[in-house]
Structures are given as C-alpha cells and as structure tokens.
C-alpha cells in the first residue's frame, strides 16, 4: 500500500490502481465542477482531473501552490490525480493487522475506509478504498 500524509494524518491506498506519483501542479479550473475538484492538468498526453485530498477526506482545504504530491490513479479508464501533502512510503500490510474503524471515530464518510492499522504511537493508519475516494459523496 502507498502511505501518504494529509492534514497531519497518515492514509494508505492499494498500489493496484496507482499510475504514478507526480509533483502537485496548479490545475486549470473547470466551470461547474463538483466540490473538491480543483480542475484539470495535462499529464503524459492526457488530461487528469485533480481532486483535493483534504476536502475529499473531510479535512479543511489548503490553497493550491503549496508543496505537495499528486497521486495519479486510473479509475474506469480515466486518470484522476489526488493531491496530498506528502507521499511517505510503500508498506506491506498483512490482513491480520487490519481492524475495523473504531466506533468512537466520527467520520463524515465511512464509505471511504477499508479499516485501520493501529500505530505504535496510539494513532491509526487509515486504509482507503481508492474507488470510493475518487467518487463524490453520495
């Protein structure tokens, strides 16, 4: 899984749909785009829809132009870029390490999460469902 940081928290996505990790660039806004869609950027001869990872994960947005990375994913043949604060590492997560979301967590969109992996510091690594992250809230 690819581990990355957004808003001071660590999240992870399965490697399967990830095409590339690129430097975040300022996208061209698209009129009428859904909330959280920052715009589009050219990428290797194609256009990538750029999504604000903070807003999609229910965190306060940050202004574009900040240092960050864009995780480019393929979803149903389309390229989508998820802007994150930083990419940390690739981690092997054993199924036995995965736990359900703690009931005490108050999350706006539980559909985004496959579960959590408890960390030694008492926090959690949040495991994300890539397909759900790329779709707007129902």
Where are these regions (language model features)?
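An acidic, low-aromatic, low-complexity terminal/linker signal
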Residues: 1-138
């Amino acid at each position: 899984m690819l581990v990355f940081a957004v808003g001071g928290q660590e999240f992870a996505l399965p490697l399967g749909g990830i095409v590339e990790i690129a430097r975040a660039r300022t996208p061209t806004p698209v009129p009428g785009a859904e909330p959280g869609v920052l715009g589009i950027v050219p990428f290797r001869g194609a256009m990538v829809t750029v999504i604000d990872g903070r807003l999609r994960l229910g965190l306060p947005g940050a202004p574009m132009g900040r240092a960050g990375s864009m995780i480019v994913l393929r979803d149903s043949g389309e390229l989508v870029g998820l802007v994150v604060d930083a990419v940390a590492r690739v981690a092997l997560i054993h199924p036995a390490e995965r736990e359900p979301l703690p009931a005490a967590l108050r999350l706006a969109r539980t559909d985004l999460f496959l579960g959590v992996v408890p960390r030694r510091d008492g926090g959690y690594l949040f495991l994300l469902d890539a397909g759900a992250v790329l779709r707007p809230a129902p």
